[in-house]
């Protein structure tokens, strides 16, 4: 699935949830994904917080939008040890303007 396709499918959902910025990383960002691959997504929630129920519903909507599993990571929840491996792969798909 192309970055443009992911962007088109997820932008309305990201907007609905008030996401400030979203980027794809991993195999999808490198063009190495397969039909069974999940989509790794890093999101910036800004100043808002999400409860567990809302977070799970958000993931469910993303997965329905793509018809794929989504591995969701928030900017604040990004592990400092994984950060150097994730940041070079980032392809921004959404920014709240």
What is each model feature region?
Residues 42-44:
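Short hydrophobic/aromatic beta-strand micro-patches
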Residues 26, 40:
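Conserved G/P- and acidic residue-centered "switch" motifs that form tight phosphate/ATP-binding loops
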Residues 1-23, 29-35, 48-97:
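Catalytic core of pol beta-like nucleotidyltransferases
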């Amino acid at each position: 699935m192309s970055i443009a396709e992911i962007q088109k499918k997820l932008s309305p959902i990201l907007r609905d949830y008030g996401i400030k910025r979203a980027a794809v990383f991993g195999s999808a960002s490198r063009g190495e994904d397969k039909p069974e691959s999940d989509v790794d997504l890093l999101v910036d929630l800004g100043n808002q917080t999400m409860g567990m129920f809302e977070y799970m519903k958000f993931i469910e909507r993303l997965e329905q939008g793509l018809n794929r599993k989504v591995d969701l990571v928030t900017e604040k929840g990004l592990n400092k040890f994984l950060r150097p491996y994730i940041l070079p792969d980032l392809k921004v798909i959404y920014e709240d303007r």
